[in-house]
Amino acid sequence: MTTAITPDKKKLVSPKPTKTTSDKSKTKPRRSSKTSKKRKSKKGLFGCCAKKRKTKRSKKSAKRTKRSAPKKAPKKAPMKAPSKPAAKLVPQQAQASLQKPIQSGIVDADATVKTVVPRPPTPIPPTGVKPEPAPRSEPLYQPRSVSSTTPRTSATTGTTEQMVTAPATLPPPSAESKHLPQDPPGDASSPRVQRQYTAEKYSKEDQDDDDQKDLRKSVAYPSHKFFMTQYVKDECRVRRWVYEDSVPLMMESNMKHMLRMASNRIAACQSDKARRCDMMKDLNEMTEILDGNF
């Protein structure tokens, strides 16, 4: 049999609707996770955790077993005290014989304590005789009474008295005088302390004055104007620090001294021609030096 193949029928496709401003695409609302959590948690915030905790606890409690009591150490038998020897029975007669000497010894001691030796009666002095006083212990030396060396005049007293002189020999100093306590340190109000304070004060003031003087001198006479000079005096060379204002006087004194020495040498060597020539050379050199300076 021959079958005729018919062409496929075209599917009827509905025309696509054109989008307009009025039409809006509708999407399914997304379920939030919070709602599902809220549905699960029926017992507050940590309900799910509480369920897990319960299951864990139930498992642990099932595993637990009752603890066995610790083994007790075996009790040791108490140590027996060493047995004392049984007291021997002593008959009553023997006990009485043992106690007798002890009692007799006690009685003898009491008797010795009670025996008192009678003292002889003190002699009563007769009524007419006075008892002698006990001897007094005299001191090492008697202190001297303070007395004035000048005689009292008749103006003060009715009669004049003789002058009291010091004893010729003084007693030796005793060892007690060495250990006498010294005077305590004076207070601030004592004159000695005040004198010391004033002395220190004045010494400080003097030192301040000296410092002020040194400052004034350093201002009036600066150090760069000082220089050392030397001159001859009594056939000795003298060196001094001299201020520049006094230089002409020092130079003049040096010149006078040198001229004097030269004249003395010339007078001494007038007879010797060679020495005189040497002296003239020295004088010429000195004149050249002085002419160059001035």
From Swiss-Prot:
Q: Compositional bias of type Basic residues: which residue ranges?
A: 27-43, 50-78
Enumerate composition-biased segments (Pro residues): 118-136
Q: Where is the composition biased (Polar residues)?
A: 92-102
Where is region (Disordered) located?
Answer: 1-215
Please list the residue ranges that the record marks as compositionally biased, kind Low complexity.
79-88, 145-160
Name of the protein this chain belongs to: Uncharacterized protein C45G9.9
Task: Please give the organism.
Answer: Caenorhabditis elegans
